[in-house]
UniProtKB/Swiss-Prot annotation:
Its main location: cytoplasm. One of its GO terms (molecular function) is ATP binding. Pfam families: HGTP_anticodon, tRNA-synt_His. InterPro entries: aa-tRNA-synth_II, aa-tRNA-synth_II/BPL/LPL, Anticodon-bd, Anticodon-bd_dom_sf, His-tRNA-ligase, HisRS-like_core, HisRS/HisZ, HisRS_anticodon. It is found in: Cytoplasm. NCBIfam families: hisS. It comes from Vibrio cholerae serotype O1 (strain ATCC 39315 / El Tor Inaba N16961). Keywords: Aminoacyl-tRNA synthetase, ATP-binding, Cytoplasm, Ligase, Nucleotide-binding, Protein biosynthesis. This is Histidine--tRNA ligase. One of its GO terms (cellular component) is cytoplasm. Homodimer. Its EC number is 6.1.1.21.
Amino acid sequence: MAKTIQAIRGMNDCLPTQSPLWQKVEGVVKNVISAYGYSEVRMPIVEMTHLFSRAIGEVTDVVEKEMYTFEDRNGDSLTLRPEGTAGCVRSGIENGLLYNQEQRLWYMGPMFRHERPQKGRYRQFHQCGVEVFGLDGPDVDAELIMMTARLWRELGIAQHVRLELNSIGSLEARANYRTALIDYLEQYQNVLDEDCKRRMYTNPLRVLDSKNPDVQAILGDAPQLSDYLDAESKQHFAGLCELLDAAGIEYTVNQRLVRGLDYYNRTVFEWITESLGSQGTVCGGGRYDGLVEQLGGKPTPAVGFAMGLERLVLMMETLGNTDVRRSVDVYMVTAGEGTMMAGMKLAEQLREQVPGLRVMTHFGGGNFKKQFKRADKVGAAIALVLGEDEVAAQTVVVKDLAGGEQNTVAQAEVAKLLAHLA
């Protein structure tokens, strides 16, 4: 017997028992974003490798350790996308969407990072991202945060997430802070772990979000980024906080929040949950006003966020918030000569007359008992029964599978009877 082939580690199937909750989450996400007037964009899964090294940063963990990179037959270095913002910016520049234009875009799809698989963190994962180009005020930052807050309410998880905010200022402000932070950290090299020592001179702001308790202890007296912010960044952040206060959105200012990608400036934010253990960030984003120019476009302000769908689904499962619509509403049961085609025709008629009604037809024969058992297994609410007598009389038996009651009705009337299920 041939050896069975397994899925790649960290890349998971979404099985029929799991997909309804995924569809619910995806549907809510799309509906909320669409309510704000944003438009969908779809980008390739594979991009040129240098897009990510230029956008994300050469010395970030993503570029150094986590990307799936390969050389194609033409000798070009290609990478499975580890995130969506860089590709969205590339698409906007290439297709002339960004120059002197305002764009509000969203996308959804798989991303890839070669990380150690664990609960809430996988090598293939799915993100929804929202990006706004051409607007530089704190008002659009606030709208994106308000959008995410609405999404949590729609998903029923608003009481289990909290918002953390920070401003990391301009490139110049961060450069000044970077120098001060390195000077401070050099005094504690005996405390820093190898990861932090490596980051200290290449990307010292990442030391701030180290999970090492010894490192966190010495950061208590480290220079504060807020002391190095430029006046415009301070004003922008104050405006954002004022708008969030007016909207009634609670938040905490976390001065160690820097995000893991190099392109951010000014506003950064994360939504955190305690429901997922160590993988507590369900959504993160911020401003990246320099990225469009960095990738070859004209200077264009931009802000956005991304959320991990696996973590949202996992969070809803953890909280028991798993009510989803059944995948089958009506199960068509037939028995007797000539009844199969009549059943298929009636099922098709119902699909046309009641948009959204989910009708499954039984195939493979078997007596009524076997067919009703199958109807129960797929979770149908109603069984429609067609025998030879019903076909001749143009009627159908409508059976409630939960209560057991059944009635015979004219086939012409059954659509009205089932409309409430759609």
